[in-house]
């Protein structure tokens, strides 16, 4: 009940994303495009048809009416791949319904939107893939993470480690230890010896 | 099994390491071991993921603490009720459980989150170099120590001492007998040692151990 | 949409007894009525089939005749249904042949042939060392009904197909896509149809491992055979790494060598699995299809000489 109230009160009226509660487990997936759109030599607009439901009299659809009067023809010319239906309905709120190639549907209420806002929403639907209901696991994803070969714990590990029996005495001590005073003296002594003989 | 599954297995496989703690400082080796147990040495490390490796530490009985730490440092135990906290000095702790010191050093090097216990479960400690066969079979790499293992005087052969270069000659006036320490020092009998009062379970601090630690058994003797 | 919320729960108790009973009765009746039957998209008021077809030609940038596209989108079941309706209405058998359109079976056959030829050609070009058997397996996967139906529904043919059921079956979707390719071939030429296949069917390989698509039962046997054909010695496998042998998460890394020459290596939970995977890795390296290999340049197939004219 409280969730329901929160949804009504806190969310803006126009929002394309549905309410998401972190208490619930919702379906999620990696980011992707439908049918690898744009990988080939052409891009296919995913919006298939657009239905604008509008009232001719009410004030709530003034912006929608404006858009239809001024921008609709231009829009249809620029985007011949979208079928636009205008549906006049008496004394009801204006709506925007987009249907996508994959069969998804988007519904956006346009009440009291001015012409610019209507244009914004229509272009928002135009550039979408169509399914905002999915939660994205990550903002980026790749199917081939590496072309050099994926790292394993064994890459760059000296190969002789497998042939030894553990505990191994060679691997116990430091790899590059500091020379002790005793060793320094011994080295100096040997150098002296060499100098004397030569 | 698909091929990408095999790659996944190879990347996330847990490698078993061996660590020989003989003559090593447990604090410094604890840092290394903790890093490996948490998987921080891997490029795939990510805080939420469990990418750590397994470590078998042997010879923990023979760890070498710095300075006077065996005597001066202690495990502070604070129990729930008032006036029940006490200290165990590390040499006593080492007698009770020879693996505990290294274990605690590794534990203190890990951030205190909930994953720490699971990471610590991948550490196997053994007081000597006797390790069960089924564990030593797993090992495929060894962690190097952080200290040079010193050579003790009684390890040296008489040949070593002979061939070592003579740095200087003793002056003739010097009586070499005077170097004998026992001449200047008297072993103090126990009844002469001043007794300290020990408060049980009162305060943390090396004066307040739960048993008596006599320290000064020797006394300087002045020879006129 | 029918509201299936139980009245009198989330909006507090209903005070009027009669209203409660009335709502409860409506609720029960709705449940008894069952789910709504599926409807054709064309049954809705905002539907103009000609406009949809026109948009469809522009969507893919193809210059198609609308009538030819209409034929391509007509399934055999639709024609059968119309004939049946006419017979029931009492029309003569001779009138049934004067329908203005045909179904898409012929076009689909043609389109499928084009797709198959092109895919084989492209795969042969890009993976020259991959055996013929494997290329056939990949082509079969790409042209299988599930794949093509998925592509077809993703391209929006689901609502455009004319058939006797509201949600078309996979075979209908498949036929529609192939018929679309066929009609491109008829209208604007074969090269254009091949570009369509490259753009929408061949790209289905993105993110997929073609070695997994072709399932080799006995990789070591195949490796031996391939090496024999190349005049090299039989493969030998050697254990490279082993860790956690007695634990649950044991890992073995096995390498495959031929005459002390490295072929491939892989990890596995047991030695036998690791050996099998190593043989697979060796095959991938021999066929040059491993991850080092670049993807097919889907947008530059012209430059590679696969498609001559644009």
Q: Where in this protein do the model-derived segments appear?
A:
Chain C
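Double-stranded RNA-binding/processing signature
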Residues: 1-310
């Amino acid at each position: 009940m409280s969730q329901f109230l929160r949804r009504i009160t806190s969310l803006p009226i126009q929002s394309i994303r549905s309410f998401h509660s972190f208490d619930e487990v919702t379906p999620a997936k990696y980011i992707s495009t439908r049918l690898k759109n744009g990988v080939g030599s052409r891009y296919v607009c995913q919006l298939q048809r657009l239905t604008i439901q509008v009232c001719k009299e009410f004030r709530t659809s003034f912006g929608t009416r404006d858009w239809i009067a001024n921008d609709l023809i231009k829009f249809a010319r620029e985007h011949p791949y979208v079928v636009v239906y205008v549906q006049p309905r008496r004394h009801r709120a204006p709506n925007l319904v987009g249907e996508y190639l994959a069969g998804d549907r988007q519904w956006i209420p346009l009440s009291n939107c001015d012409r610019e806002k209507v244009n914004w929403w229509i272009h928002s639907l135009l550039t979408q893939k169509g399914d905002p209901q999915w939660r994205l696991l990550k903002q980026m994803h790749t199917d081939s993470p590496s072309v050099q070969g994926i790292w394993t714990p064994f890459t760059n590990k000296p190969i002789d480690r497998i042939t030894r029996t553990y505990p191994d005495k060679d691997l116990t001590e430091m790899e590059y230890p500091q020379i002790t005073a005793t060793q320094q003296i011994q080295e100096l002594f040997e150098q002296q010896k060499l100098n004397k003989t030569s | 099994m698909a091929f990408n599954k095999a790659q996944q297995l190879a990347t996330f496989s847990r490698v078993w390491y061996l660590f020989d703690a003989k003559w090593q400082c447990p604090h410094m080796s604890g840092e290394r071991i903790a890093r490996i147990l948490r998987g921080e040495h891997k490029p795939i490390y990510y805080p939420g993921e469990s990418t750590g490796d397994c470590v078998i530490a042997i010879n923990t009985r023979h760890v070498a603490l710095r300075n006077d730490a065996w005597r001066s440092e202690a495990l502070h135990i604070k129990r729930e009720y008032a006036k029940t906290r006490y200290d165990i000095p590390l040499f006593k702790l080492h007698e009770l459980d020879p693996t505990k010191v290294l274990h605690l050093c590794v534990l203190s090097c890990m951030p205190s989150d909930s994953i720490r216990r699971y990471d610590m479960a991948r550490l196997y400690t053994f007081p000597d170099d006797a390790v069960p066969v089924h564990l030593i079979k797993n090992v495929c790499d060894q962690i190097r120590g952080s200290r040079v293992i010193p050579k003790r005087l009684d390890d040296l052969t008489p040949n070593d001492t002979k061939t070592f270069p003579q740095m200087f000659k003793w002056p003739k006036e010097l009586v070499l007998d005077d170097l004998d320490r026992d001449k200047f020092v008297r072993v103090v009998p126990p009844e002469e040692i001043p007794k300290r009062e020990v408060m049980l379970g009162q305060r943390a601090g090396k004066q307040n151990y739960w048993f008596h630690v006599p320290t000064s058994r020797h006394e300087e003797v002045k020879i006129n | 949409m029918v509201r299936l919320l139980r009245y009198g729960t989330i909006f507090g108790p209903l005070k009027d007894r009669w209203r409660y009973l009335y709502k409860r009765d409506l609720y029960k009746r709705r449940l008894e009525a069952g789910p709504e039957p599926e409807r054709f998209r064309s049954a809705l008021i905002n539907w103009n089939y000609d406009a949809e077809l026109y948009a469809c030609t522009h969507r893919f940038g193809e210059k198609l005749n609308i009538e030819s596209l209409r034929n391509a989108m007509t399934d055999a079941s639709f024609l059968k249904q119309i004939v049946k309706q006419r017979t029931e209405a009492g029309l003569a058998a001779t009138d049934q042949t004067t329908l203005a359109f045909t179904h898409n079976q012929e076009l689909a056959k043609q389109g499928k042939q084009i797709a198959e030829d092109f895919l084989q050609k492209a795969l042969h070009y890009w993976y020259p060392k991959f055996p013929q058997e494997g290329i056939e397996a990949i082509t079969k996967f790409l042209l299988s009904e599930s794949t093509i139906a998925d592509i077809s529904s993703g391209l929006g043919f689901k609502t455009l197909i004319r058939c006797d059921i509201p949600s078309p079956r996979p075979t209908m979707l498949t036929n529609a896509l192939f018929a679309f390719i066929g009609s491109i071939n008829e209208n604007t030429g074969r090269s254009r149809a091949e570009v369509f296949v490259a753009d929408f069917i061949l790209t289905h390989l993105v993110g997929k491992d073609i070695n997994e698509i072709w399932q080799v039962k006995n990789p070591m046997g195949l490796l031996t055979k391939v090496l024999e054909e190349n005049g090299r010695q039989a493969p030998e496998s050697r254990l490279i790494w082993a860790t956690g042998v007695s634990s649950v998460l044991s890992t073995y890394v096995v390498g495959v060598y031929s005459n002390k020459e490295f072929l491939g290596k892989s990890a596995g939970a047991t030695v036998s699995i690791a050996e099998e995977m190593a043989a697979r890795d060796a095959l991938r390296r021999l066929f040059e299809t491993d991850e080092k290999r670049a993807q097919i340049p889907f947008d530059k197939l012209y430059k590679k000489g696969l498609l001559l004219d644009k």
